[in-house]
Amino acid sequence: MSSSIVIALPKIEDAKKIRTILNRHGLTVASVCSSVSNALASISELDSGVLICGYKLTDAYYKDALDNLPQYFEMLLLASQRIIDEAPNSVSTVQMPMKASALIDTVNDMLYHLA
């Protein structure tokens, strides 16, 4: 079973930029989208992995995705410190604006624990 990465951000251009950063560090992204519904559809076809998600997507908030996220997937929320302070403990976080190194380290750590 291999772990996958799905990126869901309201601006598809931002999601593609993050995909490029991850690719440069040897991480493969399975899907890039701007809505919770598309992210969950992609996740349903994967074995396990990490959903990198923004606070508010085009069709719902991150908590809606979290409520429907299968147990074999974990969420990484990219948000402001105010939002992070309110996030459940089950959600990993990276504060925006983010440093690429913080993103890479967090994703690698999450994937390691899923393996």
Predicted feature residues:
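Conserved acidic carboxylate
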Residues: 8-9
